[in-house]
Amino acid sequence: MDGSKLGKWASMKLGTLDIQGNTWLAPMAGVTDWAFRCVCQALGAAVTVTEMVSSRALVYRDKKSMSLLRKTDGGVCGAQIFGNEPSVMAEAAAFALELSGADFLDINMGCPMPKIVNNGDGSALMRDPERAARIVEAVVKAVSVPVTVKMRKGWDKGSCNAAELAKLVEEAGASAVAVHGRTKTMLYSGVADWDAIRAVKESVSIPVIANGDIFSAEDAVKCRARTGADGFMLGRGTFGDPWLFAQCEAALRGEEIPARPPLSERVDVALRQFDLAAEDKGEHIACLEARKHFAWYLRGVPYSGYYKEKISSISTMDDIAAIAAGIKRDLR
């Protein structure tokens, strides 16, 4: 892999915001909580984004929804909201920023899940571009930070309108767009269409963030060559592997790619994440959610099946500590 041919580059502009680096952590419901975002930011993510939060829930001051907006302690962090009513989205955006102090506001027009699109939210907005543009315009007027939009390639293979929608939201005041190279109907199946992302890049003058199928440093380099994108949003590839950000950043700059640390160090990072989660959500919820995260940290580790089974019944921080000690003792 020869990232040097792509030139030395390490920053991008998001409106008036200077971003050092080009990797973004994708907003993912049930995954990108404050603890995981803090870990990813510390290990090299240039930008992190909160889990998506309902605009209606924010307007009604729902405490659980409000708790999702906690900003990372460092780095650039955006708050993502979803909804389909311009006035409600504007009010929610202003409140989200007041509550979180986020560096930018992201509008979700990409979530493909039925419970979201059936309400006209998420990727359903790709079928109503005029409404989508009105939402962006209303939110831009309501906040003083850059506004970005997360979208997909389109609704289905017969309506791949990301380039057209990107132009509309740019005209409405968006400072950047992130594009997942799959349609709504594809969900996460098949292969991300990076050529569709290139079409968006060629249609707008604002930064374009490429999303979909970036699982390695080599993927990031290939994605940049294929799309010409300004930034690269990492999603499922980061599960249990927050070191992917530093690897991608190095590859994109043509530098030597750092190796993943040994298992003992990876376990220590997992423990740090779970401590942060307990601080943020309390021990009970943190331990329930640690089950999936801890299993992800052990992906690809030989002979880890025994510990993965034990992880599935974690209920206390003491359980986590005991399992971590066993892993460090028995596995490599």
Protein language model features and the residues they cover:
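Alpha/beta catalytic cores of nucleotide-metabolism and tRNA/nucleoside-modifying enzymes
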Residues: 2-15, 19-23, 29, 34-35, ...
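Alpha/beta enzyme core
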Residues: 90-121, 129-206
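Hydrophobic faces of well-ordered beta-strands that scaffold small-molecule active sites
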Residues: 23-27, 48-50, 77-81, 105, ...
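Glycine-rich, positively charged N-terminal anion/phosphate-binding segment
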Residues: 6-13, 28-103
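N-terminal small/glycine-rich loop or linker at the start of catalytic domains
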Residues: 12-23, 56-76, 111-121, 140-148, ...
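Aromatic- and acidic-residue-enriched carbohydrate-binding clefts of CAZyme catalytic domains
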Residues: 126
